[in-house]
Amino acid sequence: MANANSPKSSTPLGEGVPPRVRFCPSPTGNPHVGLVRTALFNWAFARHTGGTFVFRIEDTDAARDSEESYEQLLDSLRWLGFDWDEGPGVGGPHAPYRQSQRMDLYKDVAQKLLDGGYAYHCYCSTEELDTRRDAARAAGKPSGYDGHCRELSAEQKAAYEAEGRTPIVRFRMPDEPITFTDLVRGDITYLPENVPDYGIVRANGAPLYTLVNPVDDALMEITHVLRGEDLLSSTPRQVALYRALIELGIAKSVPEFGHLPYVMGEGNKKLSKRDPQASLNLYRERGFLPEGLLNYLSLLGWSLSADRDIFTIDEMVAAFDVKDVNPNPARFDLKKCEAINADHIRLLDVKDFTERCRPWLKAPFANWAPEDFDEAKWQVIAPYAQSRLKVLSEITDNVDFLFLPEPVFDEASWTKAMKEGSDALLRTAREKLEAADWTSPESLKEAVLAAGEEHGLKLGKAQAPVRVAVTGRTVGLPLFESLEILGKEKTLARVDAALAKLTA
């Protein structure tokens, strides 16, 4: 057998070869933001270099994979604005792009690895492996597979099979160090004692991820593998396997690897897909803009410039180079994510903003009757709302006072604003508002300011009871513009209702 670690087995990529990258998630559960960050960096790299973005589905885990998760994954990627050059719904020269439909390919490659001496059958039972592993640990030695079945004779194999043992297939790792240059982390070397032979096919004949992932990359001619740091330790295994596949004529080259930094959650722990803030669906349901979320995720390991956090996806694509990715862990900061999304909301054309808010202006989010929604009022209030929101879902609570017959009082807001003397202030404010010019927010402001002065209050203190009386909350859109849009009759009626509640 040829040495799978020999330099001649690694064919370098030719100059000017357009990169081919892949994104290959498993359809299990809800998509998470770490997965999106990986997709984003691969997609941006492909678009920046004029390369090919391959979307592949790793659906060989029948117990965990589901068609529902698969459809949700496709929908999420489309919502984010990702397009792919090859993959589900698009096709391509290396179809099919679902691993569950490629099983015969993997079995064929596994047999070629066996025939070429790059792999072998292992008959060790789980109990035997555990016993030898424990003994190695006790002796202070590496606890990986010890090569027990590496050189079995035909007689030994026959004896094991006579016992009813069904073997797995293990890949034979070279007895030399494996070095590769990581695009993010530089040169990395693994010693042979730390990378033992590993399983590639289960005893039932099912190929493992350790085989199918590199085989698909080889057959699809992937040139760059950009993935999470958690997969770094598997890279020497895959490099050795690629070299074997090259010698078998299956692969053309070993791809370049770039391992992206961990995304950290709270408490200095890696953000897990089980963490509530990791779920992509959460951000979509809250009304994050795709461009705002992607802008923030791009900052988890990369930056456009030291003094600029807000940019478009086109600007990111124009500047993105995987070699600029920072290898240090990146912390997910929800408040910063919201702030960046708020900036992107403000960058929208007003008409675009009004349309993107539509889902939150009707059931199940809106708490008003459909017939009470007033399109004309919505069009007028929208620009004021646009400058205040962090996420689109906040629009409902900010404008409900316009469409409800009467405000829904937030109890905390009522307690905070309606202090002793608020009834007298509201009576004075009502008188002055009734006499004000209702075509001018400035006139309404002057009315409340004058009412406050009569009671020894500055505008901020004077307007708080008025705001709660009319909108039900202490915080909201610009008050006097809101009063003008609501109208004189409804505003005064709500002040009267608040006075009745105060004096009840």
Curated annotation (Swiss-Prot):
It holds the Pfam family tRNA-synt_1c. The keyword Nucleotide-binding applies. Zn(2+) binds at residues 122, 124, 149, 151. A motif ('KMSKS' region) lies at residues 270-274. CDD domains: GluRS_core. GO terms for molecular function: ATP binding; glutamate-tRNA ligase activity; tRNA binding; zinc ion binding. Its cofactor is Zn(2+). Keywords: Aminoacyl-tRNA synthetase, ATP-binding, Cytoplasm, Ligase, Metal-binding, Nucleotide-binding, Protein biosynthesis, Zinc. It catalyses: tRNA(Glu) + L-glutamate + ATP = L-glutamyl-tRNA(Glu) + AMP + diphosphate. Disulfide bonds: none annotated. InterPro entries: aa-tRNA-synth_I_cd-bd, aa-tRNA-synth_I_codon-bd_sub2, aa_tRNA-synth_I_cd-bd_sf, Glu-tRNA-ligase_bac/mito, Glu-tRNA-synth_I_codon-bd_sub1, Glu/Gln-tRNA-synth, Glu/Gln-tRNA-synth_Ib_cat-dom, GluQ/Sye. One of its GO terms (biological process) is glutamyl-tRNA aminoacylation. It is found in: Cytoplasm. It comes from the Bacteria. Binds 1 zinc ion per subunit. It is an enzyme of class 6 (ligase). Its main location: cytoplasm. A motif ('HIGH' region) lies at residues 25-35. Its EC number is 6.1.1.17. One of its GO terms (cellular component) is cytosol. Belongs to the class-I aminoacyl-tRNA synthetase family. Glutamate--tRNA ligase type 1 subfamily. Monomer. This is Glutamate--tRNA ligase.
